[in-house]
């Protein structure tokens, strides 16, 4: 699939997704999914988090991995990965895996950032989930929000979008509610994963072990570097697209920090 075709499809999907969320309560993120040759699969998850005084990120990653692994379609296998300050700020993606990082990425307007890399066929080939400690006061004010953001950013790397975008509670971490019930997946999230992964593909991206190096421009991304072209914005999030230099695309979804929400659209 050519990049321009993917970009056009993404913009179209963004419009369709907004309608779909309201009308059908489906919340798959366009058609994004990992390619697999089996009905269910294991997704290796690299832990590049460290605990701080505001949030115990390694513990929250463990909780999120356990919750998401209740799905009949995927199982998260978490392993430790380099977690120096520099490495976490770069949070370079690793092919065939998702990487989870926390760092002080700066007062750039985002609380969490989920990024997926689509290969030339439009399948997810790697992903990252970042939590921004520059807004650590958010975690202090509402400890549940740290678990909420961790769970949601990881969910995006599977191809899930939001259950609601108006701040109402769906008792799911895939909403934007501050409810203490919105810290983990619910039945609808698991059902949506069954729908997304109801078919198999001719190859697997979660099994890949090598690929061209992640572009330096993306590896150095700390929030101040442009995320690409803004293709969609809502009250609580924004979506950006950037070419990856090898025939695919990076799709970046930004969870806006308090005070940066779009009140008027």
Model-derived regions: residue spans:
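Second-shell loop/turn segments in exported
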Residues: 45-57, 134-145, 176-183
